[in-house]
Design a protein with these regions (language model features):
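Conserved PLP phosphate-binding loop immediately N-terminal to the Schiff-base lysine helix
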Residues: 1-3
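Conserved core segment of the aminotransferase class I/II
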Residues: 8-78
């Protein structure tokens, strides 16, 4: 909680939600701001919202107050760390190396083998029901085409790695 107070003093307004960590169906978020702004921000929220999901708010309140959200997050961190490790382990034999090994999160940016273009890999893969995010979709940097982003929560299928291997082989020849 102390961190949030520090954020409120330094940053003008910070908002977030629980849709990525708890459930996409829980459309309930939070805002961190200077205490003197909260009433006005609450009024603005009420004035611009068409509905309020009381059930979602009650579920969230319960999860936050009874400790189940904290337990859920701890388990989620363990699952994501395993998914990150497994994804990186599966990619390395293909010559796909993490640009940086993330300490947490759902994404890992990887550097493709020399001479392999991310957009070509993504085109091949999409035709084989594998959707990837090439670096040049995110950046205009001259080397962006050498990078690809993987969502580790969606990278636990052997079909992905077989398709990647085939795409790299085709692109390299």
């Amino acid at each position: 909680f102390r961190t949030f107070l520090i954020i409120a003093e330094v940053i003008l307004v910070f908002s977030g939600s629980f849709s990525k960590t708890l459930s996409a169906s829980i459309r309930c978020g939070y805002i961190i701001a200077k205490p003197e702004w909260i009433d006005q921000l609450t009024d603005l929220k009420i004035a611009t919202s068409f509905s309020h999901n009381g059930v979602s708010a009650e579920v969230l309140l319960s999860a936050l107050t009874d400790g189940s959200y904290r337990k859920h997050i701890e388990l989620l961190k363990v699952r994501l760390a395993k998914a990150m490790h497994d994804t990186i382990t599966q990619l390395e034999p293909l010559g796909i190396k993490p640009w940086i090994k993330p300490q947490a999160g759902i994404f890992v940016w990887c550097h493709l083998p020399k001479g392999v273009e991310a957009s070509e890999i993504a085109k091949y893969c999409i035709n084989h029901q594998v959707i990837l995010a090439p670096g040049n979709a995110f950046s205009q940097a001259s080397n962006a085409g050498q990078f690809i982003r993987f969502n580790v929560t969606q990278s636990n299928h052997d079909h992905i790695y077989k398709t990647l291997a085939d795409a790299i082989q085709q692109e390299s020849s």
